[in-house]
C-alpha cells in the first residue's frame, strides 16, 4: 500500500476549496531505493533518470466510484532497477503526492516493457 505524503494531503485540501491549488499530479516516476515510505518524504530515494525508467507523463482517468487512475507504459533500452514509484505534479522536481516501495526490486533490461497503474480511491471513514 502506498502512502499519501504531507504534500499530497495539503494539495487535496487546497484543491477542494480552491485556495492556491498546486498543479495536477500527472507524472509517474520510478526509483531504486528501498527506504520505507514516510508521509514527510518529498522525493523518491533514488529516482531513475535513463534507459526508459525516467519520469513520464501518465494517462489520467476518473473511474466510478471515487477513483483516480494514472497509467504509464515504460519501454526499456538498457538496465533499470525499480523498487519504488511516486506520483508527481511536474516533469522534473515538483511535489510528490504518494510513494510506494515494492517488496522486491524489479530488474528490467533492453527490450522489456512495464505497465504501471496507480489507483487512488476516496473512502468514507
Model-derived regions, located:
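Small cysteine-rich, disulfide-bonded extracellular modules of the LU/uPAR three-finger superfamily
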Residues: 1-83, 89-125
